[in-house]
């Protein structure tokens, strides 16, 4: 299974990544302009040199500004993390992927663990690779279900709690991130669907941010499935809260709930994703050219 061609040109902003940036930042040190242009043209053997030119000029502008050394560190480290992630994902961009979220604290003997493993196994059989946070709990269950060859792990380096699970620990598809925002960007940019299991603040953060990005047109629309285990009501209770406190209060539209599919059946979850891609091809915003 592969991306439709139009999906290969997307990024997390919803814009065409092949379209050169309209941003033009003239450096305050004009003598460098020609050098930057020549360097960009010489180095850009596979891309429009204007991309590199703007990147270098941004750095020069920062070097001549009141930016702190820490500001530079963030820029450099975030850029390097994006580059490393791109190197890992690039060979697999023709394959659809499902991001799977859920608590790192779910134990092996809990129903949600087996449900996550079963769903990932189903996803693999339907041609999808899986992307997880690379840690324990639901993440490990999903990586076990898909297997190392069909799994990505986007691990976050923390002072406590999270370490890479045994499935992806030695995989060339394990990516370690220092910054949450870069990690989250890659989850959204590289996924064709999202499946969330019961979880805490981190899982809620991923669900709400993905909903926000799709609702506001900052990410390409794709299926969001909230998957419970048989007999459990975690997501039904969550959805009831959303209806009462957000929809009934007029804080969101009833139509926004159409972005979400709640189920307790792994087979139904993957069928929902398959059905979406049998029907969906593309969409446009009014006034977009």
Regions found by a protein language model. Give the residues of each.
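C-terminal functional extensions of proteins
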Residues: 6, 226-289
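Short glycine-rich anion-binding loops that position phosphate/pyrophosphate groups of nucleotides
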Residues: 103-106, 159, 199-202
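Glycine-rich beta-alpha loop segments
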Residues: 3-156
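Active-site/ligand-binding-proximal alpha/beta "capping" segment
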Residues: 176-227, 275-282
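Solvent-exposed alpha-helices and their adjacent loops that cap or buttress functional pockets
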Residues: 90-93, 122, 146, 166-169, ...
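Acidic/glycine-enriched connector segments
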Residues: 116, 137-197
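Short acidic, glycine/serine/threonine-rich loops at helix termini
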Residues: 142-145, 164-166, 206-209, 236-240
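Short, acidic/small-residue loops that bind anionic groups at enzyme active sites
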Residues: 152-162, 197, 211-238, 254
